[in-house]
Amino acid sequence: MKLMNRRTFALALSLGAASLLIPSFAMAEDHLAEAISHTKEAIDHGKQGHAKVLVTHAEAALKHANAAEKASDNEHTKEGITHLKEAIETGEKGHAEEATKHAEAALGHL
C-alpha cells in the first residue's frame, strides 16, 4: 500500500511540475514567432532602403527575442539578439544595406 501511495505522490508531483513549466515554454515560442515575424519585416524594409522602418521592426523583434530568451535560455536566441542590436545600431546610422545583413544573420539564429 505504501508503494502505491509513493507512486501516486511522485506522479502527482511530476504532473504539477510539468503544468508549471509548459506555459513558459509556450510563451517563449509565441515571443520567438513574433521576433521572427518582425525580423522578416525589418529585412524586407532594409532591402528597400528604409533604414528607419528597419530599426522600428528590429526593435520590436529585439523586445520579443529578449522575452523568449528569458523564458527559455537558448544560445541561438542570444546570438540572434546580438545581431538584432547590431541591425538597430547600424540602421540608426542610415546604413540600410549593412543593417539588413545583421537582421538576416539574426533571423538565422531565431
PLM regions and their residue ranges:
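Long, charged/polar, soluble alpha-helical segments
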Residues: 2-6, 21-110
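Bacterial N-terminal signal peptides
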Residues: 12-21
